[in-house]
Amino acid sequence: MTAEQALPLGNGKAAEEARGSEALGGGGGGAAGTREARDKAVHERGHWNNKVEFVLSVAGEIIGLGNVWRFPYLCYKNGGGAFLIPYVVFFICCGIPVFFLETALGQFTSEGGITCWRRVCPLFEGIGYATQVIEAHLNVYYIIILAWAIFYLSNCFTTELPWATCGHEWNTEKCVEFQKLNFSNYSHVSLQNATSPVMEFWERRVLAISDGIEHIGNLRWELALCLLAAWTICYFCIWKGTKSTGKVVYVTATFPYIMLLILLIRGVTLPGASEGIKFYLYPDLSRLSDPQVWVDAGTQIFFSYAICLGCLTALGSYNNYNNNCYRDCIMLCCLNSGTSFVAGFAIFSVLGFMAYEQGVPIAEVAESGPGLAFIAYPKAVTMMPLSPLWATLFFMMLIFLGLDSQFVCVESLVTAVVDMYPKVFRRGYRRELLILALSIVSYFLGLVMLTEGGMYIFQLFDSYAASGMCLLFVAIFECVCIGWVYGSNRFYDNIEDMIGYRPLSLIKWCWKVVTPGICAGIFIFFLVKYKPLKYNNVYTYPAWGYGIGWLMALSSMLCIPLWIFIKLWKTEGTLPEKLQKLTVPSADLKMRGKLGASPRMVTVNDCEAKVKGDGTISAITEKETHF
């Protein structure tokens, strides 16, 4: 297109690949021609074949387990329908702005989660490292949930679910089937100390949980095999980059909706379903005065939108330059929140049925997180006719929901590494070997969470390594970097060059003021209200356990200030001169659309630069900084 002719560098990619091809394709004859063709294929970064692949990949990443097991419970816990008020506020002020920022940044720079920040503002390259550290932690522990789900699924192919009854080798004498309990016959049983078969299956059969993190115990080899299966599937979903990922998401991103629809129809037709839905949505406006309700709404937005992980930047970087990422982001954000809302009906209708069957208040059966997926819902399906069928559908839905979130995260980390060292990893099968190495290392690191004390380690990862506190910290710096240092007006020019028009000004002001202000407020609230983690609200970790948790949290957050300090220390000159140099975007970061191709004095990244005679744009001037 015209822009590419005027700006042959294409943000540095085309020129770099062309130089690599020329350098490696020397010599003559057929061998040289073959080598040149091979090098051209190796150095090609790749792109989505069509918009559908991008949309499904992003949808698969952001629509995950949190939509099913976290949002409905938070809605019920925080005032039902009243919770939607703070949720919508954060949806508009934080969710959409940061989601759009990361996607547009990836599309404009055509870079992964680290090098995109290096090109935009070298001083804030630490943002990229922070996101990838969080993602590396996430890749290790998130897939553990898939291993559990695969294990449960493998136990569904039977006439009677193993967690439906007592009498198995893993059950204790305290096991009581409550739905069959006759109080006159079981007067000698202390119901206060009794446990359900579904709880014993989870704690004694699946986890074989020890009494604390101090006692790691033996490896659960069955779960290790399930984890191996999960990593094998994940590897082959992404081993060819966008070529394989773009095809796999047609199944992994759409199948959960089919399962959710089936479970929704089944749920709302059960007795007691209406009571469950009532508890899910009945508004309690008095809860809005509780700051924790607003904090829960904000953190849920960050969790469910996969922001501050580098995933959206990586996925956006494979788009065509002129893709309308603004429209895509609005649509995907609405789809994500809509899915969470509908999932609440599917979950709470079943919980209402379970409360009805047991004759207890729904508050006693409502759960979130693993408690919902592996205790509450499995217990509910045992009360239904054809319970193995419904259990199979439920765990298949969980696996597909988690699978695409997992492999997209791994793909994003790989993209970040490959874009940092393109000449190393874009040759032969090195990219595939990199994915294999990351998968193997992550697999062995994850095995520690499949030991008898592994659940305690899993909770540390979940509460510290990829916590809302880390995401909020990164979001503050992302907004400051784009809104103030790089410049929101400059970034709006870049976006206009890509999509042909400027987005609503509200998003720009969110980047500059609203989003960082809200994130800072919630971050401070987190620190002030911090309470040490307890497993099941009972087990207290030893001091060194909390130390490990905080080290994992700081491992990502410290990347940003440490990188700023290192760059300032290594750069020569006075402090103003250092800031001047480190806040200027990369010289080859250019607009490739109509604005960038205009044969006149053009505005490139808010600075004036003259078009040279060869059609390229002169280097970025010193004016291109806000310092």
From Swiss-Prot:
The annotated topology with respect to the bilayer is: Multi-pass membrane protein
Function noted in UniProt: Mediates sodium- and chloride-dependent transport of gamma-aminobutyric acid (GABA). Can also mediate transport of beta-alanine and to a lower extent that of taurine and hypotaurine.
Q: Does the keyword Glycoprotein apply?
A: yes
Q: Which residues lie on this side of the membrane: Extracellular?
A: 147-220
- Could you tell me what this protein is called? Sodium- and chloride-dependent GABA transporter 3
TM region positions:
54-74, 82-101, 126-146, 221-239, 248-265, 301-318, 330-351, 384-403, 433-451, 468-488, 509-528, 548-566
Q: Which CDD domains match?
A: SLC6sbd_GAT3
Biased composition (Gly residues) is annotated at 23-32
What keywords would UniProt list here? Cell membrane, Glycoprotein, Membrane, Neurotransmitter transport, Phosphoprotein, Symport, Transmembrane, Transmembrane helix, Transport
**Tissue expression summary:** Brain and retina. Expressed predominantly within neurons. Expressed in the hippocampus (at protein level).
UniProt keyword annotation of Hydrolase present: no
Q: Which InterPro entries match?
A: Na/ntran_symport, Na/ntran_symport_GABA_GAT3, SNS_sf
Q: Which gene is annotated as encoding this protein in its UniProt record?
A: Slc6a11
Q: Which residues carry this modification: Phosphoserine?
A: S21
